[in-house]
Amino acid sequence: MDDEKNIGTVLTTYAASPPPSDENMVDPDTEYDEAFRKKAIRKVDFWLVGFYSLVYIFRVIDSSNYSNAAIINLENGTNIKKQLHLNPSQWAWTLSIFSYSYLIFEPSNTLLLKKFRPARWMFVLILAWGICATSVSAVQGFRGMMCVRFAIGMAEAGFFPAVLFHMAFWYKPSEMPSRIAFFYSVGQLSSALSGLLAYAIGFMDGLGHLAGWRWLFLLEGLPAIILSVVALFGLPDYPETARMLTQEEKTFFLQRLATTTPSGKTGNWDFKTLRVLFADPTVYTFSIYWLAHGIGGFGIAYALPTVIYQLGFTTTSLSQLMNIVSYGVR
């Protein structure tokens, strides 16, 4: 998945000071009982882990469904490549343009989270990619597809690192790994779900005089538009401003966070931070690792439905179902 390509962007927030540690925090255990703590944390988990994971399912689907569209209804003559008259070179360009815009806009999208409150910025990102994803269903040619695919990458680029950055306002460093792991794992399941949805939507080919691939993008883009409204009115921004928390719960969260936790009111990003960041060898080793991971992992994901179909022992519908297996075992 493309969301994870430049996770290092969010690390600039912390590079100007020593890594946060639970030792730097005020331990509120003596002030608050266990039932109170669990209840307060569950409220935050519902939104920052549960809601974001739900959104992430459709974010992954809205980017991975292009590979499913490559073979949907191929036998019926209503395939996307045939209807849009895309040759192999043009198809490759429409596939890769998403990653180019993603690469360009991910750093700036992430930094803008410091200028806008999280709920409002997430609303903009989710709504934008939802509209762009549904707009694919109306594309009539190569140029239109290039434009809309570029726009989808631009909108989706900031989501994954912004989620990690938003979580840092709320959780102790020791609490972050398990929540990030759950959030990321959901993305793998959504890739499997994408194949199942493509299989089902393929049977809608011709309904309302629309090809199956147009229904695919239309139906899979709509949930993001709905979820963007939920994000605007439901997501908690910062502990000190969250409407869902009581005053006592706000105090609890503020007391338990590290001194290096980012603030919702002021930022600590500057050029000194960048110098410290790029002097850290971990940045380069992680970048090399992620580059190798992306070349192998993302390349296979984009081509997998087509590869399965071209093996020659199944229909396009069954190929969509067989695509589920590889993600289910990951």
Protein language model annotation of sequence segments:
Residues D2, P173-G187, L196, G206-V276:
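Central mid-sequence intracellular linker of multi-pass
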Residues V148-Q188, I201:
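Cytoplasmic helix-loop-helix junction between adjacent transmembrane helices
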Residues S67, K272-R330:
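Extracytoplasmic gate region of multi-pass secondary transporters
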Residues D62, H85, F116-R117, A138-G144, ...:
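Helix-breaking motifs and short loop linkers at transmembrane-helix boundaries and internal kinks
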Residues M1-I71, K82:
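Cytosolic juxtamembrane N-terminal segment immediately preceding the first transmembrane helix
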Residues W47-P88, F105, N109, S194-A198, ...:
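Extracytoplasmic
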Residues L103-R143:
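Conserved MFS/SLC helix-loop-helix module at the cytosolic interface between two early adjacent transmembrane helices
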Residues W93-L111, I324-R330:
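Central cavity-lining transmembrane alpha-helices of secondary-active solute carriers
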